[in-house]
Regions:
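Helix-coil boundary/capping segments in enzymes
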Residues: 1-229
């Protein structure tokens, strides 16, 4: 029996400075300030420090062997979703990230499965990128627990879920942009409280909003902090 870790985030080692390119916003880029580590920067603000296992598939395979994990399912770090940005700019970021993951999967097909990201704030554009994700060998997509002001039962989003079903693409829902974050500045509360709350918001919106009733049968599976369909 294979041991598969479905919740593993990855980003490219080098990311364009989209804030400078597009002229607005706090897009993520990396500051490689020392060997084997980098600072994730939101515009000019520090976000998080990461190690090389966040971008190196070879380092990941070594760690997987140590922990007896056979396969990792790769998805981007949710802060990269960029749903707040202009759709065409979000599409460019998404395609860059999706091509990166697809390249790793193509190079190590027995070790990695890939999930894409799409510009959910523009459903028509999102579906086109979803179709492209299928073409380049990704197994599904990762989406946020909400899309700006839309919860996941929003009628605007249903066509995306319908397209996932028709294309047989998995849907991994990951909490992000946590509610009440301004009140939770200590004790890692955005992760300990905000992420479970966002997950509840997402799954309840889909259940009570009748999303599953309108789609072919699906079995939700709750991972570390996000349901998979």
């Amino acid at each position: 029996m294979l041991t598969i870790d479905i919740h593993t985030h990855i980003i490219p080692e080098h990311i364009p400075d989209y804030t400078k390119k597009f002229g607005y916003g706090d897009f993520i880029h990396l500051d490689h300030h020392k060997p084997c580590c980098a600072r994730m920067m939101k515009g000019d603000k520090f976000f998080r420090e990461i190690e090389d296992n966040c971008w190196s598939p070879e380092k990941r395979m070594d760690e997987c062997a140590h922990h007896h994990v056979d396969v990792q399912v790769l998805s981007t770090i949710p802060v990269m979703f960029s749903y707040w940005s202009k759709p065409k700019d979000c599409l460019e970021v998404s395609q860059f990230l999706n091509d990166h993951i697809a390249g790793i999967v193509a190079k190590y097909p027995k070790k990695f499965i890939g999930l894409g990201t799409i510009p959910m704030q523009d459903p028509a554009m999102a579906i086109k990128e979803l179709e492209r994700c299928k073409q380049i060998g990704l197994a599904g997509i990762q989406i946020g627990s909400h899309v700006n002001d839309w919860n996941l039962n929003a009628t605007e989003l249903f066509s995306i879920f319908e397209a996932c079903s028709k294309l047989d693409m998995a849907l991994f829902v990951h909490p992000w942009d946590m509610m009440g974050e301004q009140k939770m500045t200590k004790y890692w509360l955005p992760w300990l409280v905000g992420m479970p709350a966002e997950t509840s918001l997402a799954i309840c919106s889909m259940i009570f909003g009748g999303v599953f009733e309108r789609l072919p049968p699906a079995v939700p599976d709750h991972g570390a902090d996000g349901p998979v369909y």
